[in-house]
């Protein structure tokens, strides 16, 4: 279902999510077969992260704007490129894919104390906003909300402390944002960008309802 001839983080996330939530079905099955190569999966995830301590590819940047965040696949960012403080071309980290990376680490059962998880969490807190998908504007905004809810929920994050010391109740803020964006017919749609099918009401409504359901459950 992709025009690329290789893996990307979004499709990897989808596969890992399916395996994570079905793992109990095969745990004790005598004919379960060979387990996933989790080491290779984690290596691919970290190879999409702007974090030189764990990703040795030449494009990786540890500049303050990008360190810890994620890109779509090794060597490609949907947010494009930018010059860092040293004049070097950096692949820009962006919001939705960074939550995808954080969530992928969760499905691979990396603890929140792992430096890779801590690094992406720090980038996401630094760039926290509900007004846009960081570095992508309105593009993929509801997918950003959806992944934010899943990633912060699975890691048990109740409050976010921003760099200025302000504490944010992200569940309350996101719930209010989503309820305020609901259309008269009960649906949701991205009014500002059609990219990634966010002009399609069924898809965006699903993102929104799943997010609200997880927020309501609180865990």
Question: What do the predicted segments below correspond to?
Answer:
Residues 1-176, 180-219:
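An alpha-helical repeat/solenoid feature that recognizes helix-turn-helix modules
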């Amino acid at each position: 279902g992709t025009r690329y001839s290789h893996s990307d983080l979004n499709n990897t996330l989808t596969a890992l999510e399916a395996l994570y939530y079905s793992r109990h079905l095969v745990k004790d099955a005598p004919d379960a077969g060979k387990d996933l190569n989790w080491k290779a999966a984690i290596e691919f995830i970290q190879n999409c992260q702007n974090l030189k301590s764990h990703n040795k590819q030449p494009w990786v940047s540890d500049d303050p704007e990008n360190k810890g965040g994620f890109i779509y696949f090794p060597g490609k960012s949907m947010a494009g490129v930018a010059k860092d403080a040293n004049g070097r071309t950096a692949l820009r980290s962006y919001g939705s894919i960074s939550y995808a990376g954080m969530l992928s680490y969760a499905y691979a059962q990396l603890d929140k104390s792992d430096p890779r998880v801590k690094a992406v969490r720090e980038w996401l807190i630094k760039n926290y906003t509900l007004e846009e998908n960081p570095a992508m504007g309105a593009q993929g905004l509801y997918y950003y909300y959806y992944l934010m809810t899943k990633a912060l929920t699975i890691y048990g994050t109740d409050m976010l402390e921003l760099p200025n010391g302000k504490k944010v109740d992200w569940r309350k803020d996101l719930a209010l944002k989503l309820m305020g964006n609901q259309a008269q017919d009960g649906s949701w749609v991205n009014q500002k960008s059609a990219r990634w099918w966010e002009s399609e009401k069924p898809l965006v409504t699903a993102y929104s309802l799943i997010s609200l359901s997880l927020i309501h459950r609180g865990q």
